[in-house]
Amino acid sequence: MYSRIVLNDVEKKVVNLLKKTADFIESKSSSSSSLEVRLAGGWVRDKLLGLSSDDLDVTLNKVTGVDFANSIFEYVHSLDSDSVIPYKDALGKLTVNPDQSKHLETATLSLFDLDIDFVGLRAESYDDKSRIPSVTPGTVETDALRRDFTVNTLFFNIRTEKIEDITKRGYKDLQTKVLVTPISPLQSFLEDPLRILRGIRFASRFEFTIDPSVVSAIQDPKVCKAFEKKVSKERVGEEIEKMLKGANAKLALQLLYSTNTYQFTFDTLPAEKEFQIPKALEATESLFQSLALTFPKLMKLSEDEKIGLWLYVALIPWSSQTVMVKKKQFYIPAIIAKDKLKLRSTYVNQLNQCCTFNPIFDELVNDTSTKNCSSIGSLIRQLNKSWEVVFLTSVIYSCCKTPAASVSNTFSSYKSLYDFIYDKNLQNAYNMKPLLDGKQIMKNVGVKPGPQLKETMDNMISWQFKHPEGSVEDCVAYLQSLKI
């Protein structure tokens, strides 16, 4: 971690322009108080951690974000033809974000290809009905205290080019990688319970520890009620998806469960399934680490499939539970994804498919008598291209069936099945074309439309898997023999 902020070339240009604009505004003002311009929040945090960041927020006193952004244009246009050259292509689109109160209007302006938000220093107050605050003009102190965590309360003063640690602990907490709120965590989470999920996402992203006072507040029943009341299901799903898209999804899930946050994001955990989460996390980490060696041809998962796989891990304690919806059976993980997280149908369908077929793959690896070209080919044909992600979640499912299940033994069993699939060239079974269509079967075999035709077509597919080089004539002869 750095002790000071080192600006890159573009940031130097931005800061220089902000300084000159501030001087330009002050030169026309009769006020004796100085205009304070600071870069705030996530950009300061990321720069101190040695990370690149293009998320620039500028905080201002005395003027609104809109006024300052407009003053940048005014300043640049006041320059002579030689002085304006460096800024000729620097100014981009200005977007005004209106507020009911004119003195709170904010703006977004593109400078040197960076989208920068300009906002006035503010104070916030909350009621018990909404996480959206009432905003009033504030000071740098109130602006720091309104933020979610101390690591996000640091400011970079553009005049002094120094870090300002208003809470007196933001820098230390960033240095020691501890996540704590600038005010009482109970008060903070009652005001805006979404901060809990943001905190878990930050902690997993930066590998921070969560302060015990924060964990205690998360587990307060009043916070649980506030969360259910104030946070929309769509926002919960959005945060969960961001966590699982990150580089440390395992830590995110560990924190969701160790802090008991899962109770108001997912559901009440069945006591007899508590052992599954640590086992599933262990198995999934091992799976990704050994993928290149164990299942090399299954490495090309899409981002959605990877997120869906981690989502499956998050919801594995409910993977054997079902509910009937409009006379159709759905697995509880799919219902949680659909109704509690409001996630896309891509994830919902993948979860339901995985939960449906995991026990079938588990039986295939544990009962060698069922491992044949016909049964496996038909299964892959039924799953189509998604058989790969179902296969991988089945590895995790089998690892978590019992507390005593061995991860290494399970991997070995699935490696044997994987090798069988590719040795027998079954991986693309869903592309196999039937030798005969329905009309041809009825004509050549003499069956009638309906259940008898479906059964005959299923028998034909099974025969094709057993006889990949078989002819139409051989197939017809086989199907006719079944009628005798």
Curated annotation (Swiss-Prot):
One annotated Gene Ontology cellular component of this protein: mitochondrion
Keyword Transferase part of the UniProt annotation: yes
Extent of motif ERhxxExxxhh motif: 234-244
Protein's cellular compartments: Cytoplasm
Predominant location category: cytoplasm
BP terms from Gene Ontology: mitochondrial tRNA 3'-end processing; tRNA 3'-terminal CCA addition
Keywords: ATP-binding, Cytoplasm, Nucleotide-binding, Nucleotidyltransferase, RNA-binding, Transferase, tRNA-binding
GO MF annotations in UniProt: ATP binding; ATP:3'-cytidine-cytidine-tRNA adenylyltransferase activity; tRNA binding
Keyword RNA-binding among UniProt keywords: yes
Record region (Flexible loop): 125-142
Motif (B/A element): 122-124
Enzyme Commission number(s) from the entry: 2.7.7.-
Stored Gene3D superfamilies: Beta Polymerase, domain 2, cca-adding enzyme, domain 2
UniProt catalytic activity: a tRNA with a 3' CC end + ATP = a tRNA with a 3' CCA end + diphosphate
Pfam families with a match to the protein in the record: PolyA_pol, PolyA_pol_RNAbd
Domains: entry comment: The B/A element (residues 122-124) is present in cca2 but not cca1 and is thought to position tRNA-NCC for terminal A addition.
Role according to the record: tRNA nucleotidyltransferase involved in the synthesis of the tRNA CCA terminus. In contrast to what is usually observed in eukaryotes for which one enzyme synthesizes the whole tRNA CCA terminus, in S.pombe, cca1 specifically adds two cytidine residues to a tRNA substrate lacking this sequence while cca2 specifically adds the terminal adenosine residue thereby completing the CCA sequence.
PANTHER family tied to this protein: TRNA NUCLEOTIDYLTRANSFERASE CCA2, TRNA-NUCLEOTIDYLTRANSFERASE
Similarity section: Belongs to the tRNA nucleotidyltransferase/poly(A) polymerase family.
Protein name: tRNA nucleotidyltransferase cca2
Species this protein is from: Schizosaccharomyces pombe (strain 972 / ATCC 24843)
